[in-house]
Design a protein with these regions (language model features):
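Basic/charged alpha-beta structural segments of nucleotide/phosphate-handling enzymes
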Residues: 1-105, 160, 170-200
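Flexible, charged surface loops at secondary-structure boundaries
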Residues: 103-108, 131-132
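Conserved RecA-like helicase ATPase core segment
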Residues: 123-207
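Conserved P-loop NTPase "ATPase switch" module shared by AAA+ and STAND
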Residues: 106-119
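Short, well-ordered beta-strand core segments
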Residues: 86-89, 111, 137
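Active-site-proximal flexible loops/turns
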Residues: 88, 121-122
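A short catalytic or substrate-binding loop motif that flags glycine-/basic-rich loops and adjacent residues
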Residues: 80, 119-120
Length: 207
């Protein structure tokens, strides 16, 4: 809906895509593209700046940048988009840090983040601000504790990459990274012996 509204408001400024404004499939695809760009940390203005240097597709990319900017304008400050909520939280935290303060939503709070499987730009920005502001931030990842091997595409490779990114982010923000604690006891299923047995079977081949 918001992509369609952005197209309607742009009207004569959009040549390639305006005729698709009533296509639900196009609007959905455009919204997904915008979401991917936002996850990569790119804004509509940045895309507009990059588009002219993209060869034959520069015209279409420039129009996509206009749609993206219109979409951002319609959403500005509303927090309707989950990615925007992360950006708004990071804005508030960074502004408070610049004043030497901590926002109310983080005062006297312990921060625990459970099982990142992705680590996009908005999350990275908010995490960096929290690492700079808070005494401790605890992150739980699903990992086997083995060292990361370059080129590894195994089950736990994503978690290992996230752990490496977190250590780098901590150093960048002047925070120390604690030695990881590997939990080998299955506390999650302590009250469900059947599930505990299945978990052990999957991990070891016996139960």
């Amino acid at each position: 809906v918001l992509v369609r509204r952005a197209l309607e408001e742009l009207q004569d400024h959009v040549h390639y895509y305006y005729r698709h404004r009533r296509s639900a499939a196009f609007c959905q695809m455009a919204a997904q593209t915008i979401d991917e760009l936002k996850s990569a940390g790119l804004s509509g203005a940045q895309l507009a700046e990059l588009a002219p240097d993209c060869g034959p597709e520069s015209g279409k990319l420039s129009e996509l940048a206009l749609i993206f900017q219109g979409y951002e304008t319609l959403l500005a400050g509303t927090g309707m988009d989950p990615a925007d909520r992360l950006e708004l939280a990071a804005d508030r935290l960074e502004a408070a840090l610049a004043r030497g303060e901590l926002p109310d939503f983080l005062r006297e709070r312990e921060v625990f983040i459970d099982e990142f499987d992705t680590f996009n730009a908005p999350k990275k920005r908010l995490m960096g601000a929290m690492l700079a502001a808070l005494p401790t931030v605890t992150v739980a990842l699903c990992d086997d504790g083995a060292p990361m091997v370059p080129g590894d595409m195994g089950l736990f490779s994503g978690a290992k990459q996230v752990a490496a990114q977190l250590r780098q982010l901590a150093r960048k923000n002047g925070a120390d990274a604690a030695v990881p604690e590997l939990l080998r006891r299955d506390l999650r299923h302590k009250d469900a012996p059947g599930l505990a047995a299945v978990t052990e079977l999957l991990e070891t081949g016996t139960c």
